[in-house]
Each structure stands twice: as structure tokens, then as C-alpha cells.
Amino acid sequence: MARFTLPRDIYHGKGCLEELKNLKGTKAVLVVGGGSMKRQGFLDKAINYLKEGGMEVQLIEGVEPDPSVETVMKGAKVMQEFQPDWIVAMGGGSPIDAAKAMWAFYEYPNTKFEDLITPFGFPELRQKAKFAAIPSTSGTATEVTAFSVITDYNTGIKYPLADFNITPDVAIVDPELVEGLPVKQVAYTGMDALTHAIEAYVSTLHCSYTDPLALQAIEMVLAYLPSSYNKNMAAREQMHYAQCLAGMAFSNALLGIVHSMAHKTGAAFSTGHIPHGCANAIYLPYVIRY
């Protein structure tokens, strides 16, 4: 027997960020990263949409790349004080991953980080809040996956937390958020998406449900990543969808040794910060050859 899990709703297309105003609740925490969403005006849009829907909004800003256990704990404390019924995470993989882990500690304050390391060992979530994810990069696909990557810098270990409980309830895949993405990020996140799709397709857990998603994602990345890098906005839109398809595939088929090594590299060389997608791009051809 196998399981295939996706978010309840996936909104896609230009302007679909507006769907935030249709979330039903009274309080929302909005988790973001280093400031790009604020500079581009999307943070204000998101706040206004949530308020238009009748929600009080609390902001958690400044989630760093490769978020730490400490960042997760600080965010969970804010949530415990505010008591939201929606957690909305907007940005690259880091703020969304961090918010997923915060979610667990918000609902279960006595849980320890060590309790979450065991794959598929999370407690039952949605006792207090639901989760909406809005990606601003075209690579991690954490908006549709059962994974969250958190780094313990004290031990130098990057933990891929895994549980279907942390699959978001709602994913909002709006290509307008990636139109201003720097070309290096386009390249790194695009290679992350390609690696997701390839590893899902050759995974020992691949199946008839995941294969079409993985293959379509591979074809789309090959077709659109070069043009996306060259700032073709139509190609960036298609890359945003391709990475989401790859996420649907690997969330259910899982990944392989490329990602295992890339996670270790990101934690071991944290001071120099090797971007995750860059590490994937380095390892992928050697693993394929192997």
C-alpha cells in the first residue's frame, strides 16, 4: 500500500495571491524571510488581503536562509502568544520550512526538536491552526510537500523533517512573485526543481501517480529554465508551475543521494553558505554517472 498526499487547494496563475482574502479565520501569522517580499510590495498586499478577509495579522520577519532551530523556537513563541488559526508563510523555501516547524511547536509547546527528527513521527496537527504557503522562488516546492529542512548549527546537521501532517492545507502559486527573482536564484532553484523531478522518477517508491508529474516537470525545466534565467517572464511562469509539479512528485516518491549530500554540504559549510540548489547542481551529474 502507498499514500499520495497533496494540499487541499492549490491556487495558480497571476494574481492568485488575492485568494488570501478567502481564508476563513480570525487571526493569521505571516512568516517571511529577508525582505524581498517587502521591497517588492507583496508583503503589504498579503497583509491587506488577509485583513480584507477579516483577519488580525501578526508578522514574523527575518527567517534566514537554511533556518535554524533557534529561529523556529522564536517563531513558535510568537505564535503561542498570538494564537492564530492560520499560519501563512511567504517566500523561498526557508520561511515556509521554518513556519512548518513553528507550527508543530505552536500546537505542542512541550515537544522537543529531537522528537520531530524521526520520519513521519509528528503529532497530529490542525488542532489550533491551518497552513497556507506562498512560494517566491521556483525550486523548493515546499508549498506542496510533506517536508521541512531545519539546521542545527550546534551539531552541523541539516535535518529534513518529514511528515504528511506538515503538508500545507493551501498552496498559492502566483508567478508574479518570481518576476523579480535574481538570475543566480533562478539558476539555483531551477536546478533544485530538476533534481527533485529526476530523483522522484528514479526513486524506489515512484509509482503511476508520481511518474507523470516528475516527467512533466523534467520536460518543463528543460524547456523553460534557460529562458527564465534570461528574464523571459512567460518562461518564469512555467518554471513556477514546473517546480510545483516536481514537488508533488517527490513529496510522495521521496528523494535520493543527491539531496542527502546537498543537505550535508549546506550544513557543513554554513559559514561560506553553499546554496542548496547549487549543491544539487554540483552533485547531480556525478550521481547520474554513478
Positions of PLM-derived features:
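Structural motif
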Residues: 9, 28-29, 58, 85-88, ...
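Gly/Pro-rich interdomain helix-loop hinge
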Residues: 267-290
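Glycine/threonine-rich beta-strand-loop-alpha-helix active-site module
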Residues: 70-176
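ATP/NTP phosphate-donor binding region
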Residues: 1-86
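Carboxylate- and glycine-rich phosphate/diphosphate-binding segment that chelates Mg2+/Mn2+
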Residues: 147-253
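Fold-independent oxyanion-binding glycine-rich loops
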Residues: 8, 14-15, 33-34, 63, ...
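Glycine-rich phosphate-binding loop
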Residues: 87-97, 255, 260-269
